[in-house]
Amino acid sequence: MEIPRVDGFQHLHWSWQECLLSAAWPFLLIALVPGISLVSVGVTSRFRPGWLKPSVVALLLALAVPAVFFILGARKKLDAEGWAFLLIMPGLAEELVFRGVYQPLLNRVFGKPWRLAGAEFGWGLIITAILFAGSNGLVAVDPQLHARIVLHAAIAPFLMSLVSGWVRERTDSVWPSVFGHNLSNIVIPFASLFT
C-alpha cells in the first residue's frame, strides 16, 4: 500500500512524505499523551556528562557494519535527491520513533536493570532493536497480510539498532543516534563514488 503523494512530493523519487509523517507522529503523541515530553523522547540538546567519547566510539563501530557490506560487494550510486534524503530523513524519522518513543516506553514497562559502559538499559533496547530489524527486513506483505522478512536484510539493522539504542541510553538524547543513523546510510554510496 502506498500513500498518495500530495503536491510538492509528486515528482520526488524518495519517500520524503512518508518519512515526514513518521517523524511527525511522535510530536502528536507528545501533544496528546500526558507524561510524554520532548525530553522523554530524547529531543534535547542536553546530553549526559561524559557522553561524547563513548558515543563516538559506538557510532564508529556502527559504521563498520555498512563498511563490511561494501567490502562484500554492495554498491549504491545516488543522485542529489538521494544524497539529501539519506543525510536527513531516515535517521530523523526512524530514530524519533524507535529510540525516541518505543525504547523509552518499553523501558517504563520493563525497567533498565543492566549497565554497560555507563549506560543503563533493559529489554526496551532489545525489543526495540528486534522491531527495528523486522521493519527493515520486511520486504513483502501480500493482500492476506502474510509478511516475509529477509533475515540477511534484518541483521545489519538489528546490530545498528543495538548500538543506536545504547547511544540513546548513554546520552539521554536521540540526536547522536539520528546523526549516526544518517551517517551509516551514506557509507556505501560514499565509498561507491570511488569505485
Task: Annotate each language-model stretch with its function.
Residues 1, 25-26, 56-63, 125-131:
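Alpha-helical transmembrane segments
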Residues 63-195:
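Transmembrane helix-loop-helix hairpins at the membrane interface
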Residues 1-33:
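Alpha-helical transmembrane segments in multi-pass membrane proteins
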Residues 37-49:
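Flexible interhelical linker loops that connect adjacent transmembrane helices
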Residues 49-58, 116-121:
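Membrane-water interface at loop-to-transmembrane-helix junctions
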Residues 8-18, 46-52, 148:
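Interfacial loop-to-helix junctions that mark the boundaries of transmembrane helices
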